[in-house]
């Protein structure tokens, strides 16, 4: 399935993975490692890889420990400010994350805090969560779902559930 992904025309990648899979699949993309690099760089939102939990190539960038995660959380508003344009202007597909993942929830909460209801609605077709199931006979489903954020705001997203990512690609 990963070979299908590398043939797709995508705008960019946001990942928490430390490995170099994204760079190997899309060598023409510019990687930004860690929140610091992303926050303080001039990005164009196209042809870029955002490695928000760091990279094994730069051990100081890794988000590993509880203290690292606390520091990551403190910087979420800055990260959200950088990502908000991407989320509004481009579809964002979340692979390998649960909608309930605490890191994703924190980032989305920071983004929602910057938007009024009208702009939150503009995100409804751009946030797509793909959930994998181990059931080989599962027929892919696509549904709209509201995520209740901590501030009691509903964030509309699209949820795809599948056993085979090939169908999604």
Feature-to-residue mapping (PLM):
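Active-site glycine-rich loop that binds ribose-phosphate moieties when present
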Residues: 66-83, 110
């Amino acid at each position: 399935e990963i070979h299908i992904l590398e043939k797709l025309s995508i705008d960019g990648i946001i990942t928490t993975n430390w490995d170099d899979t994204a760079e190997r699949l899309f060598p023409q993309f510019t990687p930004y490692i860690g929140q610091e690099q992303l926050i303080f760089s001039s990005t164009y939102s196209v042809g870029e890889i955002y490695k928000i939990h760091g990279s094994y190539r730069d051990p100081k960038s890794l988000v590993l420990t509880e203290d690292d995660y606390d520091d990551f959380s403190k910087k979420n508003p800055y990260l959200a400010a950088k990502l908000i344009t991407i989320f509004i202007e481009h579809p964002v597909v979340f692979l390998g994350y649960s909608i309930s993942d605490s890191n994703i929830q924190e980032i989305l909460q920071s983004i929602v805090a910057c938007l009024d209801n009208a702009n939150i609605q503009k995100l409804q077709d751009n946030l797509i969560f793909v959930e994998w199931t181990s059931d080989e006979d599962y027929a892919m489903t696509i549904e709209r779902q509201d995520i209740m954020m901590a501030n009691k705001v509903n964030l509309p997203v699209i949820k795809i559930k599948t056993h085979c990512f090939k169908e999604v690609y």
